C-alpha cells in the first residue's frame, strides 16, 4: 500500500581486507531506519566502491542482495531482506493490519561489523582511534496513510526499537586506546513523508518531501579513548528534513536530480552526530554526498546539504550516458572536528552504460572535493569509483523464466 516509490536503506559497515563494506539496507542518517511495506517484487544485486586517490581515508563500498516479496504469506504479509556477507536486515510487513490505511512492520537486523567506527578529523583518518563494532536489534513500525485515494501518498511513520552494540579493536587500533563498553540503545522515530523514491540505482522518476525526529537512549553510557578523553551521551536527539526530485525525459535520455537536506541535533556524540562525505548513492536513505571526500569525512552537529545532477546521452539508443553532479554543505562541526571553512563542496562526473533490456547498469565515476584537507594541510581530494546494479526481475521477464 505505502511504498509508492518510498525507499528504505539502512547503512551498515563491514571491514573486509581493509575495505569498508557498507550494507545499505535501511536508513542510517541517524543509526536506525524507517522501512516501508513494499508492494513490488524485487530481486536486486547492488555493488558500489569509492576509492580515494589522495590520502588514506576510509573507502566507501557496499555489496548486498535485495529481495522483496509483497505476498510471502497470503496477500497481506510481505517480506523484505537485504543480505550482505556478514549482515542481515529484514522486515515482515503486515498490510492493513489495524485498518485499511494502516500497515505494521516487524524489523530485525544484525551481524558482524555493522557498528564499526572510523575517526576522521581535519582530513586525517586516525586508524589508532578507530575500531570494529558488531550487534543487532529489533524494531516495530506503524505506517499510516493520511490521504487514501490521492495520486501522491502522504504517510505518517512511527518506529521504535532496541539494539545492542559491542566493540573490539582491529589490527590498527592502539593498545592504549580504551574501547567503549558494549551497550543497548533504545530509540523512537516519527516522520511525515510525501511520496518517496525507489531503492534502486539512479531511478528515472522520484519525488519525496519528508520531515523526521528521533530520540536515542544509551542504556550504558560512559567514557572511553585515551585516558577517557571522550564520552558516550546518555541520550541524543536528531531532526532532519528532506526534499528531492528525480525526473527523466526517457525519449531523449536526459535526466535531472535535485535534493536538499537540513539536519539538526541536541546532545550528540561521535556515535550519533551527522556524518557527511563520499559519493555512493545507496549509502543511506538520505545520502549526504560530497564528491572527492572520504566516506564519513565530516562530523557535524547541524548542516544544510545541497545536491544536483544532470545526465545526457552519448549517441543513439541512450545506452551510454554522461553524468555531471555537484554537492555542497554548510556545516556546524561537532566539537573537536572543526575545519577552517564551514562550507564544503565537490563536483563529479561519470560514464553510465545500460543495455537495451535495462537488466543491469554500470557507472564509472570520478569526484573532486574542493575543501577536502589532505597531505600537509593542502585542500583538494580526488576519488574514483564504480557502481553496479543487476535486476533479476527484468532478466527473468526478458527470458520468460
Briefly describe each language-model feature range.
Residues 17-29:
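Bacterial N-terminal signal peptides
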Residues 33-42, 185-340, 372-401:
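C-terminal outer-membrane beta-barrel translocator/porin domains of Gram-negative envelope proteins
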Residues 45-47, 77-81, 106-110, 154-160, ...:
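Membrane-embedded beta-strand positions of outer-membrane beta-barrel proteins
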